Amino acid sequence: MSEDVLLEEDIWEYKSIRKRKPQSNPDSTSVSMQTVTKGKCRPKRKGSGNRKKSVEKNSTPQKSEQRLRPSEDLDPCKDDSSVYAQESVSSLTEQGSPSTRPVCDGYCPSCQMPFSLLVVQTPRWHVAECLDTPGSVEKECPDGLLCTSTIPSHYKRYSHFLLAASRAGEYLVNSTANTVERKMTCSTAAKSSCFPSPVEDSQAEKPSKNLKNVPNNECTSKIKDSEQRKSLNITSESTSSFADVQKPQQVFQLTQTTDNSCKFEFYDFTSSQESVSEDLCSQKDTSQPSLLQSKADFSDWEISYSPLSTCEESEGEAEEEKEVKTSQNKLLKVQNFEGPESNTEVFKFKKQHCEEINTSSCLYHSEKSASQSHVDSKCSNSPCVDNQQEMLSAESSFPLNCNQEFQQPGLLSPAINTGNKESQDKGACVLDSVYSCLTRTQSLLLTEGGRSPLSQKNKVLRAPSVVLTNTDKMTADATEKGTCQESLQPAVKKEENLDSTGVCFPSPISKTVSSHSLASMNAKSSPAKELKQMDIGVFFGLKPKVKEESKGEACLSEGKQIPSSVAPSGKRPRQQKRKAEGSVEDLEAVEESSNKDGGDANVTSGGQRKWRKRFRESSTTDEGARKKQCPFYKKIPGTGFTVDAFQYGEIEGCTAYFLTHFHSDHYCGLTKNFVFPLYCNKITGNLVKSKLRVKEQYINVLPMDTECIVNGIKVLLLDANHCPGATMILFYLPSGTAILHTGDFRADPSMERYPALIGQKIHTLYLDTTYCSPEYTFPSQQEVIQFAVNTAFEMVTLNPRTLVVCGTYSIGKEKVFLAIAEVLGSKASMSRDKYKTLQCLESAAVNSLITMNWDGTLLHILPMMQINFKGLQDHLNKFSENFDQVLAFKPTGWTYSDSCLSVMDIKPQTRGNITIYGIPYSEHSSYLEMKRFVQWLKPQKIIPTVNVGDWRARSLMEKHFRDWMIEGSGHK
């Protein structure tokens, strides 16, 4: 499975969560949380708008509170299928009787209404409606914390912020108790839904849930390596100031032995807590990948904010914050141990013995872990651990400014672990984000807003023991209240000599712990303060956005990089619209994005730059911006020639620029400042001089159907049957190879009589593939023209006061109105600009049929955009003395439908005295015409030039080409 797919799965939580087999362990006093789902279901995007809100309100650990996941299908008969594990270790049974109405426990995370009041709705249904219509009620319930109303409408009339905060506070306070029958909840703040999610229960992890809310603490962690035992030392300093930013170093030293065992032991400092032991991993007989929280995003990188945010509730949060601080202080009373350096708290990691890990399972978990840990600037530890012989140690020191608004919740969580026994695991979830860090990226960058990039030193990889040492300097700033947008990220560098297949690194920090910390952090802010919404780009398959890097800073490292951007002021970055990778418009603009530097561009993990909003990038860009690269299908190999490549500025190595015809999508970028040799035919040359004011000295006119020598290479221009002046270009290379570039063309059987193509072996055909799909079947040009002529003649014969109108482009579709004018015996009236354009054709026949006099003709030529009922009515009103009816033709290839296989299927639109015929007149080849031309020409190689932005479209076209050639050779 590719990295991109895993990242997207992380975002949308595409995980199958099954009921875990209950364990009856007499020695264990803690209970696992278990969630039963009925199959795997994709989450609704709707819930992503209020993730933070749901965390603030639903983090209450009610005894039998039912938890909902966005990936679960809850129907009225299955509401009981998702339950908490009871505090006894007896087996869980499903209670889903279809004959009785299920009574759901728990509370709505939005309005705090008990689910037991629901009559028809399911909890998920109710929560979804609450989130869709959040309500603007600012009046707090008069009962406050004592509200036990059983009237559903009561929860709509009043807000229950205090009740929500109280339930969240109970969650925090209870986490310090010694009871072993404690249920732990994982934060869903970074997930794509506002619903609660299944949780992991570990007594050793409870205290860490509150880390985010620790006030006035500057927590310095130092992880140190010793010879006898690899230990992890965390230094905790308490200061009264949290405004200053310190710059310490961090060294992770991860030890891996040569065998496949991956074990570590987790020791804690607090001796007053009970020892607990629990299996946190899924059993082999279940298909649940892991209970690890995926995508636990502790910043707002992958979300954009709804404008529905206020600051009015900040004063009302004082009491809530005091309660939260009280519970925090209880949790963070950690005994200090003196180590080699002062104020160090020691905790150790030992490796555990792993079963032979299934490759796909390991990669699945580790990739999902990495996608989170990269964003959260830490390597998360899988809670599935056993104690054995080998030790994993990490050495780091990094001070963090830990006020209420900004913390690294996961980095310090192991330091306050309250258990004295290690958590154990028999499953295959040891592989984790450290492994992913090593295998997925070569470097992980950290940029702190406004400050210098990471100073990376002492990066050592010792092959025998596989010890990865990394020293980073990290800084952290206090951010705006209630935001949590800054995050630190360690830089982990993968060396080339690392045998990644043999590495199985458990990392020292648990995602579950981090999620708890985030839940605690979010519980103190008002639920309606900020409504978060999933980035719309993610919905369309894009990778998650990251914050913009600090102004003017770029931490470039060798190879692929995953940036960790930190906003210097803690403000939310402005949401930007993103274009899908590989889109036709920006295909060439993305090709070289991974190796260019730009001041106003940001490199994402996919290698695509995010540009400021602009409609079209200029051909000659400013310094720091990226210049488009000419795609290969516009270059003629073995020559210095390019075809229709004017939007890329000066192309290196190009000695001649060819223009096939005068349509804007082909001459785009060609201006009066063009100073390179331009080659085209006479009609196109006249249009370039007249319309674009290109200097005549740079325009080289080539005659049609005549071999010419351009820079030592023979070139021949052929009629492309597209628009006036449109040509196909045949190149004869010195090696004897013949290359045909069709430009835009409408294949016609008459081309099979071109002398230059008869018997000519074509090596490469650059083919106009605008309609290269079987559904693009429409009548020939001659049939459509004949239909328009007959219809116009009949209408004018029946009513001589009929005005015939034909739509046209700046250049193109002329054949239709010229044929009508000839049959009606009337000139075609047109605007001065159109008249001058047709004068460039230098055709006596055309000049005899056109005029700028609107009054003396039966046929008027209007721009295509004016061929609608309103535009035609306005035009008719100007000539109401002579005409009382309008017959309009709108010749365009885009109005065809599957039913329009012949002109008999063409139906008019009529409103009053105005009739409009949309006729399927195309200047591009239909699928069958293209197929016939290719089978006749028999090129050795075909290169499509249109609709090449999508690999699926390219693959489909290549399949058509193969089928054509096989079918053509079979006829021989």
Swiss-Prot record:
A GO BP annotation: interstrand cross-link repair
Hydrolase among keywords: yes
Segments forming UBZ4-type zinc fingers: 105-135
Protein EC: 3.5.2.6
Domain of life of the native organism: Eukaryota
InterPro entries: DRMBL, Rad18_UBZ4, RibonucZ/Hydroxyglut_hydro
Region (Disordered): 14-80, 191-219, 552-623
Hydrolase in keyword set: yes
Bias (Basic residues): 39-54
Molecular-function annotations in GO: 5'-3' DNA exonuclease activity; beta-lactamase activity; damaged DNA binding; zinc ion binding
Major subcellular site: nucleus
Function of the protein: May be required for DNA interstrand cross-link repair.
Oligomer and partners: Binds PIAS1.
Official protein name in the record: DNA cross-link repair 1A protein
Organism: Gallus gallus
Higher taxonomy: Eukaryota, Metazoa, Chordata, Craniata, Vertebrata
